[in-house]
């Protein structure tokens, strides 16, 4: 059975051999566990399923198979939001992570993602699990900006006049170029 909503964080700490998965339902073959995890989540969603997936930065910036996975996500899903997480909350210290939010759409001739909203919760922010843990209150601004069901109500807080604003919209072509 396909899922309508998935929120998940891939366990990145396990030591295991590099395996290359050659699945016909994946967009590309890779030994990168995080890229395979994103592809796997996509296969679990029903035609209108929604996902929020915690991924390390390399999923957003890696070339080769990483670029293929990103392009396919932009083409076949509405990858509408990226939440750039501060260091020290999910992974070992120094590893940079994000939450990517995407909605699966039925296949069509046009690219499904038109724009991507990015909330920079990383710049000048740091948490630790024990001494300075993140709380619900720390996410209030993101939640106010997010509007998951009414994205037309979103408004950027970043501008050239307000470079400290954390909420910014990018046209998908800006990301692809």
Predicted regions and their residues:
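A conserved structural/catalytic subdomain of Rossmann-like adenosyl-cofactor enzymes
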Residues: 1-177
């Amino acid at each position: 059975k396909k899922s309508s909503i998935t929120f998940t964080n891939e366990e990145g700490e396990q030591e295991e051999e590099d395996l290359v998965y050659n699945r016909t339902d994946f967009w590309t073959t890779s030994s990168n566990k995080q890229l395979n995890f994103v592809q796997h989540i996509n296969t679990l969603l029903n035609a209108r399923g929604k996902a929020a997936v915690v991924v390390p930065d390399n999923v957003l910036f890696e070339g080769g198979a990483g670029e293929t996975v990103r392009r396919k996500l932009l083409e076949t899903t509405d990858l509408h939001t990226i939440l750039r997480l501060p260091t020290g909350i999910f992974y070992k210290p120094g590893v940079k992570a994000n939450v990517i939010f995407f909605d699966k759409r039925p296949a069509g001739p046009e690219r499904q993602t038109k724009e991507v909203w990015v909330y920079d919760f990383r710049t000048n922010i740091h948490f630790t699990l024990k001494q300075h843990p993140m709380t619900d209150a720390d996410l209030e601004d993101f939640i106010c900006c997010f509007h998951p069901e009414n994205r037309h109500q979103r408004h950027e807080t970043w501008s050239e006049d307000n470079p400290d604003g954390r909420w910014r919209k990018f046209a998908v072509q800006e990301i692809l170029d």
